[in-house]
Structure formats: structure tokens, C-alpha cells
């Protein structure tokens, strides 16, 4: 499978989804996160940036490459 060359962003979950709205939980799953301190590396797209912006209290950007 061909690997895409492009910018990536690594995010880490820093907050618990317990007692959060279902929409925020779904956004975490969309980012590939579901447990505390897990990291996920994703393509740096406007959609991913929008999901990160919706959850500033639950995720942090670790690395932008």
C-alpha cells in the first residue's frame, strides 16, 4: 500500500470522556483516542484540526510534522 507523504499531527488524550456529551465522545473516537494518555498520529487536514479545536480540554497536540 502506498504511503502518503504529507504533514501529520500527533495528539494525546489528556482528559476523561466520563460525564461528557456523546458528541465529544464520538469526536474522540474519530481522532482514534479512547483512553487516557493514548496518542494518535493523523494527517494534518482541516477536518482533523476542527476536531482538535472542539476538544481543547480533552486533547493536546504533541507533535506537528
Swiss-Prot record:
Biological process per Gene Ontology, one example term: translation
Keyword Chloroplast: no
Cellular component annotations (GO), alphabetically ordered: cytosolic large ribosomal subunit
Molecular function terms from GO: structural constituent of ribosome
Keywords: Ribonucleoprotein, Ribosomal protein
Coiled-coil boundaries: none
Superkingdom of source: Bacteria
Subunit structure: Part of the 50S ribosomal subunit.
NCBIfam families: rpmD_bact
Similarity remark: Belongs to the universal ribosomal protein uL30 family.
Protein name: Large ribosomal subunit protein uL30
Source organism of the structure: Brucella canis (strain ATCC 23365 / NCTC 10854 / RM-666)
Amino acid at each position: 500500500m502506498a504511503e502518503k507523504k504529507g504533514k501529520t499531527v500527533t495528539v494525546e488524550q489528556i482528559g476523561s470522556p466520563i460525564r461528557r456529551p456523546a458528541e465529544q465522545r464520538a469526536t474522540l473516537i474519530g481522532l482514534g483516542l479512547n483512553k487516557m494518555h493514548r496518542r494518535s498520529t493523523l494527517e494534518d487536514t482541516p477536518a482533523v484540526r476542527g476536531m482538535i479545536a472542539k476538544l481543547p480540554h480533552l486533547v493536546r497536540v504533541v507533535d506537528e510534522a
